[in-house]
Amino acid sequence: MFLKSKLYQAQQFAKYYRRAKTRYNIQTPFVFNFIENVLENDRNYYGFSIIEALRHSLLKENKSIELIDFGAGSQTTKTKFRRVNQIANSALSSDFQCRWLFNVVNEYKPKHILELGTSLGISTLYLNAASDNETKLFTLEGDPKIAHIARMNWQNAHHLLMQYTLANYDGVTDDLEKHIENDILKSAPEIRLIEGDFEKTLTTTLNLLKTVDLAFIDGNHRYDATMKYFHQILSYTKAHSILIFDDIYWSKDMTRAWNEIKNHASVTCSIDLFWCGIVFFNTDILKVQHVTLIRAKLKPFKFGWSF
């Protein structure tokens, strides 16, 4: 099963690469803006190093925990007991992917964010770092032990940010430390983590959010579940909403789900980045667009064919 799935992904990547366009092949203003300000944006923010330090510590953590898997499971192991570093290595979005999520939030300024699949909380921290204190950020995690680790990571991130900020001051007093901590707390939204099976928690969370400006869906890689999440969230979207589906080439089922989602009547633009798919509902886009993109440095040569 593992080799079969990896072969499928390799075949799909070859097709993706051949059809993918770079910033030099796009003229549509909406998509070009996405490329310049999101996909090709390599600006570094001080918070990134703090979050990546947490990722590094997770990759060294050998403690084992027993998991409850509500999703499609892992393609690397089927055991219920897994080490934290195994989870970090296989389940966390990469450094680049997380920075990309940060860019999405930073560019489009969503005020109601939903994440399906908290995992160890690293991607959540990037979403949080790009948000202001008026943003509502809800993240759903099925496994209580993983949720506990995520909460601990968020606390550690807060402490590291405090240390980083205080290091820039001479003669730190208790009052100054308290003032800085209050500023940090006010600058980013509270992360609301909801534990439990998405079948039970998604509806409740959507009712609390009332609208979804941005959703990052990375919790279940089955066709039926993905389509159900899409239709549930769709009822809470507006013209400015953005939905991101992770691992669209994880399996034939996920690719099937992605193809149906991007061709839904309400979608005005879809972008395929291979590792994820993004759909927009922007009514200012008069002609439906389906675009496959890749960073220019990853495709310096232009192929003369596609399929």
Give the ranges of each region predicted by the language model.
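A short alpha-helical cap/connector motif
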Residues: 1-214, 221-242, 249-307
